[in-house]
Amino acid sequence: MELLYADKRIAVAVKPPGILSTDEPGGMPELLRRQLGTPCIRTVHRLDAATGGVMVFARSAAAASILSGQVRDHQFRKTYLAVVRGDPGQSETWRDLLGRDPVRRRTVVAQEPGPDVRPAELDFERLASRDGL
């Protein structure tokens, strides 16, 4: 596991694609607990299992509370870099409704509002384009 930073409150590590963000067997918290030799690693934000990237983890209940509050209050910003095929446009904001598919146990785009549906917003900017990518 590539550890970018660690102190007594937080650990910052690179989550590889295919590894869960959550505290499941083989997930990032379990892997970091083993690597750091610490009993407490808590997830405060998530990346989809197929997504790789930098994640911040709390190393105590107090740090988890503070960081989770920052995520909830939108003081925590995630930035993604991606390579796509085709031309999505220069820059846009895409808005969708996200719900949970109980059969496949995954998040899906919902067609209409509902009790378990929440809005999602993605702002993107094309940084470069080459050979259809």
Where are these regions (language model features)?
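RNA pseudouridine synthases
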Residues: 1-131
